[in-house]
Amino acid sequence: MIIAKQYRCIHSATCHCTKGHLSEEVLFLMVQHLNWNPNVIATLSCVCKWFDDLAKRLLWKEFCRARAPKMMSDLQSSGSHSVDGSWRALGKLLIYCSGSSKGGLFNDVQISGHFVHRTRFSRTSGRSFLPPQCRTDDILYVSDPCEHLDQGEDGDLGFFRGIFKSFSMSKVRKLLIKKGTPFHPTEVCPYCKAKLWSMLQAKMIPQSASCRLGAYEDSIEYYVCLNGHMLGVCTLLPLSDSEGASEFQ
């Protein structure tokens, strides 16, 4: 069920919305009891601005920590209590495959976005997507590919997504800027609406990425946004071929 966001208040000191409903502590315990169900959090966000502020400030953060505790601990290990692009955007990235619209980021690929029940994000896998000169310092978590099989002429497609740690300080970002890589002229990040760089256009996709994905080398394309969210697509090798592929370092 899709619920339209409705802001019925302006969150002022005299706002009636802040009176007569459960306190933040009770709402926190309620959503915690429901195991940080993203459907519940999203529904609460649509009630009014007060609930939306609470969700963005607290509930989505706890959802991320519950869904991927080790990754969240690493992303915050520098001492920051926030992440690039907001907790809500990161929560969406954890559970949503963005797909692609025709004429969008991935040309003629047209696959609807959808929620995924569970996805594994790996820091080890992320190293395979970094240019060799960036692997010493940069940290990137990347998901296993979300498989969309038998896509006609496109074959078996895999969509993957990821998140950089402290992207604003990363070597990848500095290298993209040094190369003068332009932003995509029309499309933005589906998770935070920030501008996107094409790693393919910047010629920064290493061979190791195709081996990690089990994909054809010339079929991989991915983007990184200003907040360090990554999304990409590849054409997967037939299972018999990809099983025998060795990882390129």
Curated annotation (Swiss-Prot):
Ranges where the F-box domain occurs: 16-68
InterPro entries tied to this protein: EID1-like (IPR040267), F-box-like_dom_sf (IPR036047)
PANTHER family in the cross-refs: EID1-LIKE F-BOX PROTEIN 2, EID1-LIKE F-BOX PROTEIN 2-RELATED
Protein's name according to its UniProt entry: EID1-like F-box protein 2
Gene: EDL2
